[in-house]
Design a protein with these regions (language model features):
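Residues at or immediately flanking beta-strands
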Residues: 20-22, 56, 92-96, 126-128, ...
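EAL-family c-di-GMP phosphodiesterase catalytic domain
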Residues: 1-7, 11-16, 31-32, 44-50, ...
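Catalytic core of bacterial c-di-GMP phosphodiesterases, primarily the EAL and HD-GYP domains
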Residues: 68-141
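Inter-domain helical "communication" segments and dimerization helices
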Residues: 1-22, 66-69, 87-90, 118-119, ...
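Hydrophobic positions in alpha-helices of CheY-like receiver
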Residues: 117, 149, 197-201
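Mobile, glycine- and charge-enriched loop segments
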Residues: 146-153
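Charged helix-capping and loop-helix junction motifs
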Residues: 111-115, 143-144, 191-196
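A short, well-structured catalytic beta-strand-centered motif of the EAL phosphodiesterase domain
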Residues: 22-59
Length: 253
């Protein structure tokens, strides 16, 4: 895997992104209807027959700045894919993309994202940008980017929230439209704390997407605490964009 990771990083650094970067989609489901309402775009590295998970190369690209061209490339390819879907089938789905602080530090990020969206005739209201990490005192450009994205109609989410303490610290920086709870929130040792966190979220009226849904007990527990949306192996693993198109973007018969 080390050789494959090196290949992916080199593809980004040499601007040969199409040779080493691709994306998959993990469907997001309405928990009450067991219906797919969209999907999360997830970057993957590719080298020969190997699929390289993002944890192998993202941190390195964040250090070198390669995350910027890679992020733009994935966003552009995802927008093109979504734009190719039948008009009637892309009016309602929600697609989520992960955005790092390094990207948000770039003052031109929101302008590029909105320009790409406009060129593909896509509506901002169909997208959620998940903020994957941030420091307690972000640069001014971060808030400016979030402002511009929000004003344009893109919904924002804090990603990977695993505790009430983390949630409150994130909301002190920016109040988002969604909270994405980490899969660890559903483990037996954390579930009671998760219920308390959900009670707090319900009081401030923010929608939740829960990761790591693996059984019907998870579904019923989340529904009882006001969670509408989820993703996990009970519904689907991350799948190729071609599979997502065939499975979830076809007209009802």
């Amino acid at each position: 895997m080390e050789k494959s990771t090196h290949f992916v990083v080199q593809c980004v650094e040499k601007n040969k992104l199409d040779a080493g970067i691709d994306f998959v989609i993990q469907p997001i489901f309405d928990l009450s209807r067991f219906a797919c309402i969209g999907g999360e775009v997830l970057v993957r590295g590719t080298h020969r027959r190997n699929i390289v998970p993002p944890n192998c190369f993202i941190s390195q690209l964040e250090e070198t700045g390669g995350i910027l061209p890679m992020g733009d490339y994935v966003m552009a390819q995802a927008f093109k894919f979504i734009a190719r879907q039948p008009q009637a089938l892309r009016e309602n789905p929600l697609f989520t993309l992960n955005i790092s602080q390094v990207q948000l530090n770039d003052a031109e990020f929101s302008s590029r994202a909105l320009d790409m969206m406009q060129k593909n005739n896509l509506s901002p209201r169909n997208f959620i940008f998940e903020i994957t990490d941030i420091i307690d005192t972000p640069e001014e450009s971060v808030c400016q980017n979030l402002d511009q994205l929000s004003e344009a109609g893109i919904q924002l989410a804090w990603d990977g929230i695993d505790s009430l303490e983390t949630l409150k610290s994130r909301l002190a920086i920016w109040t988002t439209d969604y909270i994405k709870l980490d899969r660890s929130c559903l483990t037996a040792g954390n579930i009671e704390k998760t219920f308390l966190m959900l009670d707090y979220i319900n009081e401030i009226d923010i929608d939740v997407i829960i990761e790591g849904v693996e059984n019907y007990t998870h579904v019923s527990a989340m529904l009882r605490h006001g969670v509408k949306y989820g993703q996990g192996f009970l519904f689907s693993r991350p799948i190729s964009k071609e599979h997502f198109h065939q499975e979830y973007m076809q007209p009802e018969r």
